[in-house]
Amino acid sequence: MFGIDEVKIAIIGLGYVGLPLAVEFGKSRQVVGFDVNKKRILELKNGVDVNLETTEEELREARYLKFTSEIEKIKECNFYIITVPTPINTYKQPDLTPLIKASETVGTVLNRGDIVVYESTVYPGCTEEECVPILARMSGMTFNQDFYVGYSPERINPGDKKHRLTNIKKITSGSTAQIAELIDEVYQQIISAGTYKAESIKVAEAAKVIENTQRDLNIALVNELAIIFNRLNIDTEAVLRAAGSKWNFLPFRPGLVGGHCIGVDPYYLTHKSQGIGYYPEIILAGRRLNDNMGNYVSEQLIKAMIKKGINVEGSSVLILGFTFKENCPDIRNTRIIDVVKELGKYSCKVDIFDPWVDAEEVRREYGIIPVSEVKSSHYDAIIVAVGHQQFKQMGSEDIRGFGKDKHVLYDLKYVLPAEQSDVRL
């Protein structure tokens, strides 16, 4: 086994997780950043991160980092970190395609003694049961004799400028005690918050998947509370504010649960659970409730429009925001699409305005073309769907200026004071 000074790192996948890793390692040691997306590589070489997770200055500081889409350029590396997405399919089952392809790619360049670390969120057992056999088959080598693996789950929070890679504690693990120690030592070089060496790869995998499952369930609880309080004509935000006066009340807010983690990861755990004969009722109940919130929001809006005497069929609706969270360009698994589709069933004409998104990416992924400018006095209903700073700065007067004389303003994200909107979650 090689020592810490002999580690030659390749980061496989340069998205929200991989790029920050590559940049931090690249500030102090030779690193190759690999991605199959040639456009992405060209942008990064020009100092541009369209995800806005890394600044041009930070890219310049990573003077030992090289970007490539050529497999040959990673052959000399011996420490591979795989950071590809792990989505779900239309049946809400794990889609391991990116992980499988990345494992096949790395397997073709593995040499004896090499280490492969996975950061992608998976179910417990996936690394050793799914990925290791691929590495062994592609390389023709024996696991834990010729090559080794580890698991260190990503904890990146897209758009968060306070909690970043280096100041979030990192869980590490390895397939042998010696390998676990080396992997931990490698990450300690860039993680100022420190590391936590888990007892096994499965423990590390399970720890990651329950982080987001716990959060998903807490949001499901407040979503259900919001539905109850709306029927009781009680303002949900006011209730949460009052309850939050106790020190141990958890400050979760209701809303649409999208993105690449919280709305996806629980399905990885439930998939594994059902595979071993246990039906996880609470986790799946929470997922069902959160998955249906788009329909609930749409129904709330329609009822408010009818109450105001607005003809729903053929009405114009403006949705402010399309990303899955505020102040971030990430549109992966955004559940605002559920609202768009549901309103379409009522023959509403929906416009999307979001200054953070790449319009072409939205068109390609969702078949929607966002508007670049918003018409004044045009809409029968307006939904503030994402709490972007730009929308907060507008205030209710400017936002209502997009509406007709008679319209409904739905503040989904508590951007405005309660009395300034017609409907709130």
Curated annotation (Swiss-Prot):
Record: residues binding NAD(+): 17, 35, 40, 86, 121, 332
Active site per the UniProt annotation: 261 (nucleophile)
GO molecular function: NAD binding; oxidoreductase activity, acting on the CH-CH group of donors, NAD or NADP as acceptor; UDP-N-acetylglucosamine 6-dehydrogenase activity
Xref: InterPro entries: 6-PGluconate_DH-like_C_sf, NAD(P)-bd_dom_sf, UDP-Glc/GDP-Man, UDP-Glc/GDP-Man_DH_C, UDP-Glc/GDP-Man_DH_C_sf, UDP-Glc/GDP-Man_DH_dimer, UDP-Glc/GDP-Man_DH_N, UDP_ManNAc/GlcNAc_DH
One of the GO biological process terms: capsule polysaccharide biosynthetic process
Phenotype of null mutants: The disruption mutant cannot synthesize the Vi polysaccharide.
pH-activity profile: Optimum pH is 7.2.
Catalytic activity: UDP-N-acetyl-alpha-D-glucosamine + 2 NAD(+) + H2O = UDP-2-acetamido-2-deoxy-alpha-D-glucuronate + 2 NADH + 3 H(+)
EC number: 1.1.1.136
Top enzyme class: oxidoreductase
TM spans (from-to): none
Keywords: Capsule biogenesis/degradation, NAD, Oxidoreductase
Biochemical pathway: Capsule biogenesis; capsule polysaccharide biosynthesis; Glycan metabolism; Vi-antigen biosynthesis
Summary of subunit composition and partner proteins: Homotrimer.
Sequence similarity: Belongs to the UDP-glucose/GDP-mannose dehydrogenase family.
Function noted in UniProt: Dehydrogenase required for the biosynthesis of the capsular polysaccharide, commonly referred as the Vi antigen, an important virulence factor. Catalyzes the conversion of UDP-N-acetylglucosamine (UDP-GlcNAc) to UDP-N-acetylglucosaminuronic acid (UDP-GlcNAcA). Cannot use UDP-GalNAc, UDP-Glc and UDP-Gal as substrates.
Protein name (Swiss-Prot/TrEMBL): UDP-N-acetyl-D-glucosamine 6-dehydrogenase
